[in-house]
Amino acid sequence: MSLSNKLTLDKLDVKGKRVVMRVDFNVPMKNNQITNNQRIKAAVPSIKFCLDNGAKSVVLMSHLGRPDGVPMPDKYSLEPVAVELKSLLGKDVLFLKDCVGPEVEKACANPAAGSVILLENLRFHVEEEGKGKDASGNKVKAEPAKIEAFRASLSKLGDVYVNDAFGTAHRAHSSMVGVNLPQKAGGFLMKKELNYFAKALESPERPFLAILGGAKVADKIQLINNMLDKVNEMIIGGGMAFTFLKVLNNMEIGTSLFDEEGAKIVKDLMSKAEKNGVKITLPVDFVTADKFDENAKTGQATVASGIPAGWMGLDCGPESSKKYAEAVTRAKQIVWNGPVGVFEWEAFARGTKALMDEVVKATSRGCITIIGGGDTATCCAKWNTEDKVSHVSTGGGASLELLEGKVLPGVDALSNI
């Protein structure tokens, strides 16, 4: 899935035109303060390009959080983003208190030349996702006629459409696939992300190592399956390693994560790895805890000793880190999706931190290192390594689906060239 046959912003004539742009400003917030502005910064080049090339206006639309179609301005307003964007762009940003309807259409119909306008959270309307919840929390579906009206209103806000929301590219939501304008182009962030993944998956440097962490095997089955056709080596770490170790080594895992569904296909995955000549590295030792808690009592365990009843593994141990480091040293290209321990808690962060240090070291010797968004991107922010690896993806779910070999609806909807 690349952008090679799709219209991109650098080929779009924006002079004198109103540009309506879907961005991903779904940033982490604490008490209405933005805690990581990576996604806002990432959209700036596309916005600046439009302004520098004489666009009449740039109307920005995004979601934030999961309000499920209910307006929650106190919790999920994009207003703080307008303030942040103003300081990043060095110019005024007009914030509108809705994203569709007559007042919004009027404000966007004939704005002053060079205006930047940010709409309120798209997901305050159930028509964006097509489903949500009502005020009492019951599931609701959007009516088709109302979805049409919502999409028609968004389409009135610009003359051309740009999608730079890679983080939402795997969602067939109204703002991603339903804006009906003659020209629909991918923005620079979308282009950068897709080019990186296309190169990594279609013509990788070898040896190619995938590092897969996270909790559930079942969630990552398609990922493991698809990557086994592409890589030379694979590290399987994090919570899902316990399902592998229990099935393959009959290891005692205590109350560690065990995935019943995933367990059924562990042997199939391992035989595919063998058939494809992929070297698999699993953890051999662990930092354990007597409960899932930041301040739990901690212990050590190995695959041979097993994890005692009532205890769980929350990080890999030093021997595993050594094995992981050896795999990283052999690689010329690395794709990393999912942490190898509960990195949010100091006591269980060492394994992921040690691995990050090795990946940074590998990058400095010329290895291509790609971090699939989500938790692994958060690790980069936490340890300040975002500019010490080749590419940190802004999209967790979107990068996951690309690595699984899927077509992204948001990219599919762009104009062909």
From Swiss-Prot:
Pfam families hit by this protein: PGK
Residues modified as Phosphotyrosine are 76, 196
Where in this chain does the entry annotate a coiled-coil region?
A: none
The N-acetylserine modification is found at 2
Q: GO CC annotations?
A: cytosol; extracellular exosome; extracellular space; membrane; membrane raft; mitochondrial matrix
Q: Where does ADP bind?
A: 214, 238, 343
Binding positions for AMP per the UniProt entry: 215-216, 220, 239, 313, 344
Q: Name one GO molecular function term.
A: phosphoglycerate kinase activity
Which InterPro entries does the record match to this protein?
Answer: Phosphoglycerate_kinase (IPR001576), Phosphoglycerate_kinase_CS (IPR015911), Phosphoglycerate_kinase_N (IPR015824), Phosphoglycerate_kinase_sf (IPR036043)
Q: Which residues carry this modification: N6-acetyllysine?
A: 11, 48, 75, 86, 91, 97, 131, 146, 199, 267, 291, 361
For the modification N6-malonyllysine, which residues carry it? 131
Q: How is its activity regulated?
A: Specifically inhibited by heterocyclic compound CBR-470-0.
Q: What is the effect of changing residue 88 to P?
A: In PGK1D; with congenital non-spherocytic anemia; variant Matsue
Give the GO biological process terms.
canonical glycolysis; cellular response to hypoxia; epithelial cell differentiation; gluconeogenesis; glycolytic process; negative regulation of acetyl-CoA biosynthetic process from pyruvate; negative regulation of angiogenesis; plasminogen activation
Task: Quote the record's binding site residues for ATP.
Answer: 215, 220, 239, 313, 344, 375-376
Residues that bind CDP:
214, 219, 238, 338, 340, 343
Supply the alphabetized keyword list. Acetylation, ATP-binding, Cytoplasm, Disease variant, Glycolysis, Hereditary hemolytic anemia, Hydroxylation, Kinase, Magnesium, Metal-binding, Mitochondrion, Nucleotide-binding, Phosphoprotein, Transferase
Q: Where in the cell is it found?
A: Cytoplasm, Cytosol; Mitochondrion matrix
Changing residue 252 to A: reported impact?
Answer: In PGK1D; with chronic hemolytic anemia; variant Antwerp
As for PTM, the annotation reads: Phosphorylated at Ser-203 by MAPK1/ERK2 under hypoxic conditions, which promotes its mitochondrial targeting.
Region described as Mitochondrial targeting region exposed following cis-trans isomerization by PIN1 and recognized by the TOM complex for mitochondrial translocation of the protein: spans on this chain? 38-43
Function of the molecule: Catalyzes one of the two ATP producing reactions in the glycolytic pathway via the reversible conversion of 1,3-diphosphoglycerate to 3-phosphoglycerate. Both L- and D- forms of purine and pyrimidine nucleotides can be used as substrates, but the activity is much lower on pyrimidines. In addition to its role as a glycolytic enzyme, it seems that PGK1 acts as a polymerase alpha cofactor protein (primer recognition protein).
Q: How does it assemble?
A: Monomer. Interacts with kinase MAPK1/ERK2; the interaction is direct, occurs under hypoxic conditions, and promotes its interaction with PIN1. Interacts with peptidyl-prolyl cis-trans isomerase PIN1; the interaction is direct, occurs under hypoxic conditions, and targets the protein to the mitochondrion by promoting interactions with the TOM complex. Interacts with mitochondrial circRNA mcPGK1 (via its 2nd stem-loop); the interaction is direct and targets the protein to the mitochondrion by promoting interactions with the TOM complex.
Q: What is this protein called?
A: Phosphoglycerate kinase 1
Query: Which species does the entry assign this protein to?
Result: Homo sapiens (Human)
Q: Which gene encodes it?
A: PGK1
